[in-house]
Amino acid sequence: AKEFKKGITANVLYTQIGAEEHLDHALRFFMSAKSAYVSGQAVYIKDNGDEISLVDFDETKPLKGKKILVTGASRGIGESVAKVLARDGAELYCLDVPASLADLQKVAGNLGGHALPLDITQTDAGEQILKACGVLDGVVHNAGVTRDKTLANMSAYKWDLVLNINLKAISTINNYLLTNNGLSESARIVCVSSISGIAGNLGQTNYAMSKAGVIGLVEATAKSLDGSARRINAVAPGFIETKMTGAIPFAIREAGRRMNAMSQGGEPVDVAATISWLVSP
């Protein structure tokens, strides 16, 4: 993938014997402009016995009738995810911290969704989500923070803050929703990881650990969902042009842009398009 010119992508689909009828969904995504920033990826397609019906499927509104929660939805990637999911027909519940309520209400209001101000690190966050949203068809765990320092200069507070928001909250909320009938039988969960969780990054030990943990959590949870129609996946974006990454020193930003397969930074909508595909039926 790294040998191609800009604008050319290469991915591979591993398909389990007997799962060929599930290929259409993936091929439509990878052959469309929606996958423009997805390259060098391996996707595994399995048949878990769930039935496929395209009779009433509307490709222009693939998420019509689906109730989906997006965390960290007041800005950046979360806001873009909310916009794309709304475009694709989803009923949205937009969640962010109470301090971002004004921005959150603006995003949710513009999309005809619901604003849910909530600190996801609260021990009863899962309970509050279920009470506010009811049974969900999808959850996008996008909320996350950085508190960058080299390991030698990392305070316990910054370490714990990043791990609690980026990883522990996801695990706690998923566990509550899965054990308290908070997810529909064919629900989709998508967790936002990062390339830092795969390759690490200088001065981001806490962030890299949290995002690596997200990948491990998804892989472990996927095994527990085996045999059901529920799905869980993670996306690990490379360098994405957001306000958060805009605060990174220029040299590091430029290195981040050049390290990915596309040799350029992505936009939040690129991540959003991939997430919309993963939460679609």
Which sequence ranges carry the predicted segments?
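Substrate-binding pocket helix/loop in short-chain dehydrogenase/reductase
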Residues: 150-151, 158-159, 256
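C-terminal helical subdomain
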Residues: 8, 12-53, 58, 234, ...
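Canonical Rossmann dinucleotide-binding motif of NAD(H)/NADP(H)-dependent dehydrogenases/reductases
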Residues: 62-93
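Conserved glycine-rich Rossmann-like NAD(P)H-binding loop of the short-chain dehydrogenase/reductase
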Residues: 90-104
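Alpha-helical segment proximal to the catalytic Tyr-Lys
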Residues: 2, 36, 179, 223-224
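Residue(s) in the substrate-gating loop at a strand-loop-helix junction
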Residues: 194
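Active-site helix of classical SDR
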Residues: 174, 210-213, 218
